[in-house]
Amino acid sequence: MIDQSRAYQYAKWCTQRGNRKVGKYVKLQAKKWLRIADGRRKDAYVSEKAYRKICKLLKLMIHPDLHCSMYDGLEDYAWFLIAAVFCTRRREDDRRFYQTAILEIARKNFKTFNSAVIFILGMLTEPCL
């Protein structure tokens, strides 16, 4: 299921040879995440259960500008960020593999909007301590 996701497709696109539309560090991170998603890392995996949960939640949320579900309205890079942060788990204790996420894009490119979506998903999915 994850290999048909927009996050996976975006990561594949980022790592294509000769792709100059993404930065060096985005390519490196996409390569690392693809290794995890393909099951080639012993310490981490992409949880299908967590991915399905995120998809269901995004289908319930309405995009304010596009008037469609967030599932359909999010950009591919946002899908990649969300899938990597919320669906990538450690094998040893099933906790999130990535504890910190950095989104560095130019101004006026939905950073605050994507941060709000991530914040809402975090409130709905992360356990209370």
Question: What would you call each of these model-derived segments?
Answer:
Residues 1-129:
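Phosphate/NTP-binding elements of NTP-utilizing enzymes
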